[in-house]
Amino acid sequence: MNYIQNYRISSNSVYAPKFGASNPVAGKESQPQSKEQEIKSLSNVTPDYGVKAPMSYTKTGELKISDDLTAQCYKLANGQKVVIVPKDGTTVVKTYVNTGSMNEPDNLRGISHYIEHNLFNGSEDLGDKVFFDEVNKMGANTNASTSFSVTDYYISSNLLDDTDLENKIKLHAGMIQSPKFLLDKLEKEKNIVNSEINMCLSEDENIGFTQTVKNLFNIKSSSNDLVAGSTDNITALTRDDVVNYFNNNYYPANMTTVITGEVNPDETMKLVSKYFNSQKVPNLNRHFETMTPIDKPIRQDLISSKSEGGASIFLGFVGPENNNGEDIVKVNALYTLLGDLANSRFSSLEQKYSTGVSLQKERISSKPNDNSILVFETEVKDDYVEPFLKDLYSNISKIAVTPPSEKELTAIKNKMKMGHDRWLECSHALNHAVGSSILDGRSEYLSKYNEMI
């Protein structure tokens, strides 16, 4: 299982709520200079005790992604990284928190996903307002996802009103920095999350992928799904568990916010510094799952009553380090060679067994230097499992002794460049590429992608 994606809402409404501008509150009361100047009282004024000073920030550089796209890079004084990429189209405000299920002790497995759910259930900054109602008023979309190593949240829409961008950033910052974690909401969300866990466990693909990760990296866990966790874990969670995990992982220096769309970087950064002003630092050592790659092949056959004469096959390999942009480009080239050309290396295999073979790279650890995983996945009839595996291994082995021809290499490069151009056009795809690259410190993957190809 790659990730769990949750709430998605959309609306055609174009009304944007007007958030009142806050007046700065002096940190120290001034003494009146004369009797005439002294103010005895102020009527019709509601004090706002939540006003905070904007966070100072520095510009750390620029990344030229293409002829038309340049990323402006900043760092807030609290350690949070911010990247802003002006472009036409939808504006996406997205924050990547560098934590996931591999940062959870096994008895808390699933808490990252559970917290992701609960961040939509109200924040101190939002007050009595309902998050989804405010998003709907802007005609915006919102969603989140949890994976092995990262949890991300976004709000996206076209900017139809002058206040839309500020409202989006304010809502987004509030949910990530100051969730209420109300007891009644926490208990209610357990039922929803447990239903999702049961759904995940009913799908052979999730079980197979999880077991591949466990076997490849020697991970011991009582949960059959490493991202979703177990219903026993979720049911037993206390509010203290939630608050402690949140405080120890959701701190500014562990987050990257990326904004792509029709924005002015300077003005946008002022808004970010106004609302992303947390001073939080972790007070405990973070948990990192021990990942020890196996030194010899492991095969495990799992019997499922849901297979109906078919078998799902997962073949896992240790992949490149998260921060190794050059090798990640090579993985993309390998995928293209194997299955994304008109006459790919897997074409005859897929035709012979009437199936398709996918290859995906997954970030497992939140540490930049740790290895990723490469997984081949397919489905075949039960009777074809053994001959298919033999042919699959043979096809993979041939690549080592029969590298791409010049014709294949040219086709691979053209295909990769076309794919690169396509994701540059989409705000969401561009945002994801920027966020994942910045998390792992491989900015060259953004600025030198075509050169590496």
PLM regions and their residue ranges:
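A structural supersecondary motif
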Residues: 139-141, 314-318, 338-380
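Acidic/histidine-enriched segments that form metal/cofactor-coordinating
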Residues: 44-52, 97, 124, 131-245, ...
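Short cationic amphipathic helices and targeting signals
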Residues: 152-156, 251-262, 374-379
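His/Glu-rich zincin catalytic helix
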Residues: 39-130, 163, 170, 243-352, ...
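Non-Sec secretion/translocation targeting segments of pathogen effectors
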Residues: 1-49
